[in-house]
Amino acid sequence: MSEIRKNDHRLMQVLLAPVISEKATLVADKNEQVVFEVAPDATKQEVKAAVELLFKVEVNSVNVLVSKGKAKRFGRFMGKRKDVKKAYVCLKPGQEINFEAEAK
């Protein structure tokens, strides 16, 4: 863990954006989890360290998934949307991340 903390510049690049969707809000209310879009090469340990550093909360666990991009047609050519890596961050009881307050 101390090796990861040394490289704060890398931790700033791990979290790309919070995922704001219906499923993400249900998970946040029910399980005290927050969903982030993360860098494709990010590890669970890096995500945990980045969330603890940026939001000053304690993280219980991290689950990650890679959502494959859809094949889409652009005129007569076939293309593909980018793959997205998401991290479901489970916070310890009593911890909360409020994005509205963070933005102000």
Swiss-Prot record:
Q: Which SUPFAM superfamilies match?
A: Ribosomal proteins S24e, L23 and L15e
Task: Please give the name of this protein.
Answer: Large ribosomal subunit protein uL23
Q: Which family does it belong to?
A: Belongs to the universal ribosomal protein uL23 family.
Task: Provide the function of this protein.
Answer: One of the early assembly proteins it binds 23S rRNA. One of the proteins that surrounds the polypeptide exit tunnel on the outside of the ribosome. Forms the main docking site for trigger factor binding to the ribosome.
Q: Which InterPro entries match?
A: Nucleotide-bd_a/b_plait_sf, Ribosomal_uL23-like, Ribosomal_uL23/eL15/eS24_sf
* Alphabetical list of HAMAP family matching this protein: Ribosomal_uL23_B
Q: Name one GO molecular function term.
A: structural constituent of ribosome
Q: Which Gene3D superfamilies match?
A: 3.30.70.330
Q: Which organism is it from?
A: Paraburkholderia xenovorans (strain LB400)
Magnesium is among the record's keywords: no
Identify the keywords attached in UniProt to this record, alphabetized. Answer: Ribonucleoprotein, Ribosomal protein, RNA-binding, rRNA-binding
Encoded by which gene? rplW
A GO CC term attached to the entry? ribonucleoprotein complex
- The yes or no answer to whether the keyword Ribosomal protein is present is yes
**Mind giving the lineage of the organism this protein is from?**
Bacteria, Pseudomonadati, Pseudomonadota, Betaproteobacteria, Burkholderiales
Q: Name one GO biological process term.
A: translation
Describe its partners and assembly state. Answer: Part of the 50S ribosomal subunit. Contacts protein L29, and trigger factor when it is bound to the ribosome.
